[in-house]
């Protein structure tokens, strides 16, 4: 049995969260790839919910397009990466347009490219030097209540110091 470190920070949290997971996916039409950070709440043994800020995250747009095509979106979640990759992954619209590879920001900060490797169970890439990687698929036409297991009404504490509401539109 393997366990993943996923803290529940306060009694109001929706559940245990994987923090600073670098989500990596490829656009189903264009082949353009991207890396972003998202709220990842453990919902069950083999299920994570992922919150895409509407209109603001590139992988959210990729998941929406895959859903339009009736396809699952393969995704890797790399945890424990170089801080330059975490910084680069924070560049989102409108700073960087859809199709811009934020890993190039990380590469510029590091003065060397970010190495990728093939996933073992899904057709996607992952950050090669991560401490560990979770592989999976974003499922089309399925949304879950973020706090479906705790019913607290909240998600998790955010960096500005507040706890936001749980989303009813998290992807699985």
Question: Language-model features: where?
Answer:
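Extended, highly charged
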Residues: 1-172
């Amino acid at each position: 049995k393997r366990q993943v470190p996923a803290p529940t920070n306060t009694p109001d949290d929706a559940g245990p969260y994987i923090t600073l997971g670098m989500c990596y996916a490829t656009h189903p039409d264009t082949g353009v790839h991207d890396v972003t950070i998202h709220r990842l709440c453990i919902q069950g043994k083999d299920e994570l919910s992922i919150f895409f800020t509407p209109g603001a995250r590139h992988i959210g747009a990729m998941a929406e397009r895959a859903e339009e095509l009736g396809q699952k979106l393969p995704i890797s979640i790399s945890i424990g990466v170089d801080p330059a990759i975490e910084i680069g992954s924070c560049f989102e619209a409108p700073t960087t347009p859809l199709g811009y590879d934020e890993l190039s920001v990380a590469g510029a900060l590091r003065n060397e490219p970010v190495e990728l490797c093939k996933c073992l169970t899904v057709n996607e890439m992952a950050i090669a030097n991560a401490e560990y990687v979770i592989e999976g698929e974003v499922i089309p036409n399925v949304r879950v209540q973020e706090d479906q297991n705790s019913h607290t009404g909240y998600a998790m504490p955010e960096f500005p110091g507040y706890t936001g509401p749980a989303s009813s539109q998290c992807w699985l």
